[in-house]
Amino acid sequence: KASVGFKAGVKDYRLTYYTPEYQTKDTDILAAFRVTPQPGVPPEEAGAAVAAESSTGTWTTVWTDGLTSLDRYKGRCYDIEPVAGEESQFIAYVAYPLDLFEEGSVTNLFTSIVGNVFGFKALRALRLEDLRIPPAYSKTFQGPPHGIQVERDKLNKYGRPLLGCTIKPKLGLSAKNYGRAVYECLRGGLDFTKDDENVNSQPFMRWRDRFVFCAEAINKAQAETGEIKGHYLNATAGTCEEMMKRAIFARELGVPIVMHDYLTGGFTANTSLAHYCRDNGLLLHIHRAMHAVIDRQRNHGMHFRVLAKALRMSGGDHVHAGTVVGKLEGERDVTLGFVDLLRDDFIEKDRSRGIYFTQDWVSMPGVLPVASGGIHVWHMPALTEIFGDDSVLQFGGGTLGHPWGNAPGAVTNRVAVEACVQARNEGRDLAREGNEVIREACK
């Protein structure tokens, strides 16, 4: 009879992929998954299944397994802990060997870790809560084109949050009227104005016309105020080539900053653009359109802190990060957790802020968090307190909605932010007297 190589049939994942005795290595990429298994599937099996399907595993032994070293390449579920207050959920910790991932590719990282496993039958739901990126891997990325310090030096603006404004109505203005709104806001005292995320190149306003009129607005406002101004020109396009064409044209116009929608545009396009921006001295503003599709459900998808880490590696100088106080969702401690992950070099593990792993970015530049969405001048005390100086505060309707017009709206915001910063520096309690501070300043 023929010799038997191995037993065919379906194998339990936990025999190979659940290894509670494993000591994680400094070079491992660690993931924390929130797992909701189907009824009857034990936690160890579900955790091991996640580790297997997002690394080397398939549902049975294949003879080519003998041609490689499984121990060197397999993902391992090394710890499981129940989620407080949830009966059928637990956190599975998975360690991936560094060699599973292509250097400098967020695309490959995500394809491996979250590519296939989320459709897995044995799981009712799965959410990636956090990733620990080891320096051995993060060092293969360029990261943000410039980072917080270089941006401040380029703009010559220190010691306060930067102010922005999204031009509204976001769709329908002609390029010239759009440029006029940009000029009024910048002239009134804002640092930046912004293309809305869905302003690309539509029939009512083609991208090139918008770029030209906005550049004119920037130059005029700079000449009149003596400050450096910018407008986030949205370079997002249907193809990478078209996106690069727009970024190159922006550079030729001499503007300081361009913008990209990194989730709809994709990580590959974003990383290419970030490299171009560093090589050519452009700042890069990142909008997170589509993030809530991925991060809003509490038990399925990916937490935004993972998308934020991925963006810091892929590259961007600003990224939208919720407001804590405006019209869109976001809890304070958790938001501050990923705001620190964007800005700081070293972030301690702190479960109360949703940070599952200590993250050491070594020398990778930081990203400025952008607070945007339904905020207005009376939120200013809270925003200065929550976000501190290293942030961009964006008031769209909160600038353009001023009954006297765009420029007075911009003046209001600039006066308010400077008053709040000064009051804070003098040791006054913004939470209590913030509104009073603003009223005094506006007299």
From Swiss-Prot:
Residue numbers carrying N6,N6,N6-trimethyllysine: K7
Positions with a binding annotation for Mg(2+):
K194, D196, E197
* Cofactor dependence: Mg(2+)
Q: Which residues constitute the catalytic centre?
A: K168, H287
Q: Which residues carry this modification: N6-carboxylysine?
A: K194
Q: What class of enzyme is it?
A: lyase
Main localisation: plastid
Q: Which residue numbers mark the site Transition state stabilizer?
A: K327
The protein's matches in CDD domains, at most eight in alphabetical order, are given as: RuBisCO_large_I
Superkingdom classification of source = Eukaryota
Name the InterPro entries on file: RuBisCO, RuBisCo_large_chain_AS, RuBisCO_lsu_C, RuBisCO_lsu_C_sf, RuBisCO_lsu_fd_N, RuBisCO_lsu_N_sf, RuBisCO_lsuI
Q: Name one Pfam family in it.
A: RuBisCO_large_N
UniProt keyword list: Calvin cycle, Carbon dioxide fixation, Chloroplast, Disulfide bond, Lyase, Magnesium, Metal-binding, Methylation, Monooxygenase, Oxidoreductase, Photorespiration, Photosynthesis, Plastid
**Any single GO CC term annotated in Swiss-Prot or TrEMBL for this entry:** chloroplast
This molecule's function is given as: RuBisCO catalyzes two reactions: the carboxylation of D-ribulose 1,5-bisphosphate, the primary event in carbon dioxide fixation, as well as the oxidative fragmentation of the pentose substrate in the photorespiration process. Both reactions occur simultaneously and in competition at the same active site.
Description of how the protein assembles with itself and partners = Heterohexadecamer of 8 large chains and 8 small chains; disulfide-linked. The disulfide link is formed within the large subunit homodimers.
Query: Additional comments on file?
Result: The basic functional RuBisCO is composed of a large chain homodimer in a 'head-to-tail' conformation. In form I RuBisCO this homodimer is arranged in a barrel-like tetramer with the small subunits forming a tetrameric 'cap' on each end of the 'barrel'.
Family membership, please give it.
Belongs to the RuBisCO large chain family. Type I subfamily.
Among HAMAP family, the record links this protein to: RuBisCO_L_type1
Designated name of the protein: Ribulose bisphosphate carboxylase large chain
Species name: Abies homolepis
